[in-house]
């Protein structure tokens, strides 16, 4: 497998072709120092077999950005500790140097004086105007700071310096952003001038260090990203970078639009390997190694990119969050057991946008590396799991890995629970990867599956269990609205499961995630759809990277959205409601209920009377859960056994 072959980059060798590309994690200390959580995260990736890790957005100045920083000598030791740790696994460490594109000193002074409003106003101004206003003197100072940062990194044992070609540097390069009329603006040669000065500065202070350059491409049809170069100029710039001493080029999507879905597309919003046609053009223009990122999910995706001459090295970001042992499993011939990313963006991209730390909804160990681990139990137990949804299967998986005997009861004839309907709406089919992974793990771990069996206390006690984990799920709520039980009123879950199919004019009551997804599905099927929601937001729970796409779809299909509106009654041919403006009557042929879920009840008194230890996880645990909570609760409940 080419993916697992070594490759020479500059004066170093990578043991395979898999890198962890730069991602903001939120794990670092407030001053940007590598702290224990950050250290453990990267060490765990190295242990999993990746050959090259890039720490994203390492600032050479003291910024307010929640990213790593290396701006004073006191931070060197933490970086050295990390470099030593990943080197133990024959993994190379890189840092991506970036500048936040605002006047760091002026902003810091405003905040130091307590002028928070002035500081925020200054930052908003600079994010738009800094590229036009930064002086030659300031640029020279930035270059000096970069040089000092590189020297610190080299003394810490960092192997590779990646130049972040977006943000400040990409803004200089961009015809869409750079409006300067001096030697840094206008012509192609002028616009790339500062980028080349950065490369020269790195080579000046660290002649032997490996240089990687993240080359952002402004992709077209539609135009996405602003900071960077159009592909024709990107190809020419790549040639110049090689002549300037750069050892490797990392091709990525340009950013600067404010929409992270441009650079980290969620499920169904971009094709797999969507940067490949741009990456290949750059690879064909240079002789140095080229890496690529962008919705590369499976080993087959990655292998094809290398085999077809698209790139030499593959960046797996979200995929390694979902399964840090991705490479190890490939090396062991167990690629079928990789826990593949769904590209939901809930635990990763959304977390960073909300200033939380990086995680993955499918991996309960993310952010808790070496704190949460599955170790064999000292005593083998009999564990019964009630429910074969996400929480139940994760609990069964963890209990089995610990060495327990596990029996899982599921009332349906198939596993998956709500995953089976969650993967039905537009763009959501990639959620099936989670279902396939968990279902396969039940087989690999020899979990005793009792499908089509509604478990009761007598049935469970017959198994003589030591522990019972209840993951009985939830059900869609039928609200106490007049007319809610009429024959033309359908259950959203049943609609998603294709058990009930409305047509014509449809009113969806409830604008949460399920209601919004059901509305989009019905609109796509040709229905005339209205959504009525009591609160002020539609699909509030959806990923921030997906919501814009969802609302574009609503606009395309002319879905009527009514927020702050309460339904008062359902009639044979209308939904009656009221809001701040008065009464509303919506003519309809069908009504779909999506007002929320309620936990399924499961009586465990008889089990507890017999001394059986019982725990509840997932939707049935007091309140309906999302997939992140379902996985985490299933993991934690089983891991203490």
UniProtKB/Swiss-Prot annotation:
Question: Which residues carry out catalysis?
Answer: 167
Q: Which GO terms describe its molecular function?
A: 4 iron, 4 sulfur cluster binding; FMN binding; metal ion binding; oxidoreductase activity, acting on the CH-CH group of donors
Residues that coordinate or bind FMN: 96, 214, 295, 317-318
Q: Give the matching Gene3D superfamilies.
A: Aldolase class I (3.20.20.70), FAD/NAD(P)-binding domain (3.50.50.60), NAD(P)-binding Rossmann-like Domain (3.40.50.720)
Please tell me where [4Fe-4S] cluster binds in this chain. 341, 344, 348, 360
The protein's matches in InterPro entries, at most eight in alphabetical order, are given as: Aldolase_TIM (IPR013785), BilR_N (IPR054629), FAD/NAD-bd_sf (IPR036188), FAD/NAD-binding_dom (IPR023753), NADH:flavin_oxidoreductase (IPR051793), OxRdtase_FMN_N (IPR001155)
**UniProt binding sites for FAD:** 391, 410, 418, 428, 455
What keywords is this UniProt entry annotated with?
4Fe-4S, FAD, Flavoprotein, FMN, Iron, Iron-sulfur, Metal-binding, NAD, Oxidoreductase
Q: What Enzyme Commission number(s) appear in the record?
A: 1.3.-.-
Q: From the UniProt record, list the reaction(s) this protein catalyses.
A: urobilinogen + 4 A = (4Z,15Z)-bilirubin IXalpha + 4 AH2; urobilinogen + 2 A = (4Z,15Z)-mesobilirubin IXalpha + 2 AH2
Function, as annotated: Bilirubin reductase that catalyzes reduction of mesobilirubin and/or bilirubin to urobilinogen, a key step during heme degradation. Urobilinogen then spontaneously degrades into urobilin, which gives urine its distinctive yellow color.
Q: Which NCBIfam families match?
A: bili_reduct_long (NF045599), bili_reduct_N (NF045592)
The family annotation for this protein states: In the N-terminal section; belongs to the NADH:flavin oxidoreductase/NADH oxidase family.
Q: What is this protein called?
A: Bilirubin reductase
The record's gene field reads bilR
